[in-house]
Amino acid sequence: MAISPRSDATFSSQKSTPSESPRTKKFPLTEEEIFYMNCRAAYLTVFKSSLENIISKDQLYLALQHAGRNPSQKTINKYWTPQTAKLNFDDFCIILRKEKPTSKAELLKSFKQLDVNDDGCILHTDLYKFLTKRGEKMTREEVNAIINLADVNADGKFDYIKFCKLYMTTNEQCLKTTLEKLEVDSKLMRHQFGNHIEGSPERDPSPVPKPSPKITRKTDPETFLNKGDTRSSLLSATRKFKTSVSFTVTMGANGNRNSKLMEPNLIKDWQHMQSKGCFFLEEDGEIISHQYRMQIAQRSMVYLTIKPLNLSQVEGKPSPWLSVDTALYILKENESQANLQLVCFTELRNREVFGWTGELGPGIYWLIPSTTGCRLRKKIKPVTDEAQLVYRDETGELFLTKEFKSTLSDIFEVIDLDGNGLLSLEEYNFFELRTSGEKCDEDAWAVCRENFDTKRNELTRQGFMDLNLMEANDREGDPCDLWVTLHSMGYNKALELTEACPFVIDIYAEKCKPKIKAVHMEACSGQLEKAICKSVLSNGDAKVMDGYENIIVHTYSCDTWITSVIENKSDEKVIIHISNELSKNCINNRGLNIFAVEVGPKSTMVCQHVMPLNERQEWIYYCIYSLIS
């Protein structure tokens, strides 16, 4: 697990000057980057810094309005409960993901209910009654403010078509204004920090010269400030860092092939077990997956691999999620499940396969799958066309569409963990927990076996199809529940798998038959976070904050990704500001170039994972860690 020396991966703390970082081409922002830019623009309209917290309902309401939302009091109360003391910028982003902006069509549909003459207008008396007596009631003054809008009112009538157009135009103008303000502030910050590079550095995969050795190791952002310039209170408020430390890692295109994963000799003679599983992306961006127990009966050489599962039936057109990184952390159980010791992880790679080879003693091991979140992430792009799931023939009988049956077949392939072509109760229950939050008990499973096609007391693929058809029939053809199932499994309205990544684990043992069983489906945190921190602390490059020996930044680099961990040995919490603005051809799991993390006393935390945006080109990781408090 030690990091091997490599000629194309170097650690330094040197900073590139602007003249050394020419930008040759601008790349369009991704939907994800546009989303975060809009979030940041709205947040900074209300606060001086994204490090400030929302501390009241009024602030939350105002920030949501600037983000183009029109939250009701019910919505505000959902996110600001009696137990809420504060919300940070990350919380704000999560809320915006869940609360979609009101569309023009939705507004028109709401007003049209009151349009008795179907002429695009509503009588002021009807509008007044509706707004003051229905739903979340408005005050007389609030209604009068609407009625007094000259552009949309005339002759005692409210022109709701004009109002909707005005509403959408105003929203767009507000967003444009906040984005323009953000760009002005960003240019000012780049100017004051000596960085005149335009655009988003993460979007430029072009090679850049290596950092000049003339720049000193420690970076003090205050030395770059134009001290005579008082235009930005944001800079003076948040950029006075106590100390900083930086890392640079330069990686060649396609990684370093010296560490390529190799199969052991005579592996065909080893005993083999396999299990499938899946990473699922939650609404808040958290990733959950199956977790496993593995039993090794006697000391043996073991070869472990994990890779994304290809479901494509079209030759030459693999499943799009094959680019998602996967890893497997192996922990040994000592006396109890609570006492797990990190043994190794699959750091070697051959294309989409990640693996590890070594000797394991007899015992129980936990296999915890991991993905960085750099590539398995929320897709902001909306899907306009909804796939049809069911149809009726000329007799009125309900059937599943060909497209939906194909999707169900893929889902069956994913949840059939042992790959025997059948679903056991245990396998089916992982599916039920994911889609409904409940388990199927023995009695319900017996009923299922009586009514649907089974083999050896396990559900067949056809039985699984018929089970979903029954669900559609129970709802008289309404596909609502079917869509809940599909969304839970990571599919969008076009039946594309965009928020999940199925994978397959292979275990080979030389001297015994290994056993593997899926036992949980949990968030990729907790034990996994501890395992990642321990592996990075053991194998990474460590740098101490100058003057603060209790704060250490650890950075681990392999051919595929870079992980940083912050260790706080002090008795107080610290806030660390992270800037990736000078990184090239990089993407991180947080989706932000600049962010801050709070590290509790006597604790370690994973700060970020970074991967190349384009693996076929060189990528440069340049990150500055600064102590705020």
Swiss-Prot record:
Region (Disordered) location: 1-25, 195-229
Tell me, what is one Gene Ontology molecular-function annotation carried by this entry? calcium ion binding
Q: Where in the cell is it found?
A: Cell projection, Cilium membrane
Q: Does the keyword Translocase apply?
A: no
Q: Where does Ca(2+) bind?
A: 416, 418, 420, 427
Q: How is this protein named in the record? A: EF-hand calcium-binding domain-containing protein 7
Gene Ontology cellular component terms for the protein in this record: ciliary membrane; cilium; cytoplasmic side of plasma membrane; plasma membrane protein complex
The record, for PROSITE patterns, names: EF_HAND_1, EF_HAND_2
Indicate the quaternary assembly: Component of the EvC complex composed of EFCAB7, IQCE, EVC2 and EVC; built from two subcomplexes, EVC2:EVC and EFCAB7:IQCE. Interacts (via EF-hand 1 and 2) with IQCE (via N-terminus); this interaction anchors the EVC-EVC2 complex in a signaling microdomain at the base of cilia and stimulates the Hedgehog (Hh) pathway. Interacts with EVC2 (via N-terminal end). Interacts with EVC.
